[in-house]
Amino acid sequence: METKKIINNSIAGFFSAITIGALTLLTYKTDYGLFLVASFGSTMVLLYGYPESPFAHTKNIFFGHLVTATVGVTALTFIPLPEYILIPIAVGLGVFFMIMLNITHPPAGGNPIIVIIGSASFDYLISPVITGSVIIIIFGVVLNKFILKKNYPK
């Protein structure tokens, strides 16, 4: 493997740890609430490993997470079905809306599962989904545009 690729991959891994570390610190060491969603870990792979992918675009990260989490909370709140029926319906609807709105972000496909299993309320959309996504996007722009000098965001 060439040296430049090893360096870039190391930087991507380092920034993934820094980004998730910042969200973890905000979650556990402040009184501001929750900033972490499990699917953010997968977002790191796309954002830092494959920033040229359309799935890693800023609008896809932000709106993909927001739409699928909204679908999950809405389904949980308004559809009185057992979780084993509700979860697949919500995931399917989340995928449908991401594709229809051209905001597909594969890691966000897991958000309805997280929301329903965790019995999240609409507050969950503000924090961690919106605040966490914005923080992730800021870190992604700093790394890709200013440090690695990539054409990001597109």
Predicted regions and their residues:
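Alpha-helical transmembrane segments and their membrane-interface boundaries
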Residues: 1-74, 79-88, 119-154
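Alpha-helical structural signal
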Residues: 41-42, 94, 110
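Membrane-helix interface "capping/anchor" motifs
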Residues: 52-60, 98-108
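Buried hydrophobic packing segments
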Residues: 74-75, 97, 113-115
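Internal alpha-helical transmembrane segments of multi-pass membrane proteins
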Residues: 80-105
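Membrane-helix boundary connector in multi-pass membrane proteins
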Residues: 101-125
